[in-house]
Amino acid sequence: MSKPFQPISDVINTSPKNKSQSFNEIYGEPENFLEIEVKNPLTHGYGSNLFTDYEIVCRTNIPAFKKRESRIRRRYSDFVAFRKILEQETTRVIIPPLPGKIFLNSNKFNDLNIEKRRQGLEKFLIVVSGHPLLQTGSKSLIEFIQNEKWDPKQIIY
């Protein structure tokens, strides 16, 4: 006499019947991932000495990066210096533009202008950090994203 029919999933499945698995348990961590966020703008100073800085949050498992997760703050002028460094560091990659400068006669510290700039800076970093040549070959990128003591004057080309 023949055996009763059993679905293949019952035959293969060795885990308990009702145990649900998370996405990471099923698929594991992606081989190389890099997540970048620019958030939490803070305006500092007073009078004509106002400036805004932005928090950069980086999560990655790429071996070239020193830390799996980092949080640092950067000013717009830091992004400008970083972009110039990238342009000098590599001629094989077109570096995207930064969001435009806000002119002094406009209210550059209102919430709308700060949010537009934050979005533009995040887009810039996502594009730059997503480029395979920069992701693994640019020490400047890693330093800018992860080193709290980053100083553009100390960069040697």
Curated annotation (Swiss-Prot):
Predominant cellular place of this UniProt entry's protein: cytoplasm
Keyword Transport in record: yes
Compartment(s) of residence: Cytoplasm; Golgi apparatus membrane; Prevacuolar compartment membrane
Domain PX: 32-152
Topological category with respect to the lipid bilayer: Peripheral membrane protein
Residues bound to a 1,2-diacyl-sn-glycero-3-phospho-(1D-myo-inositol-3-phosphate): 75, 77, 101, 117
Residue spans of biased composition, Polar residues class: 11-21
Family: Belongs to the sorting nexin family.
Protein name: Sorting nexin-3
Native source species: Candida albicans (strain SC5314 / ATCC MYA-2876)
Organism ancestry: Eukaryota, Fungi, Dikarya, Ascomycota, Saccharomycotina
Gene: SNX3
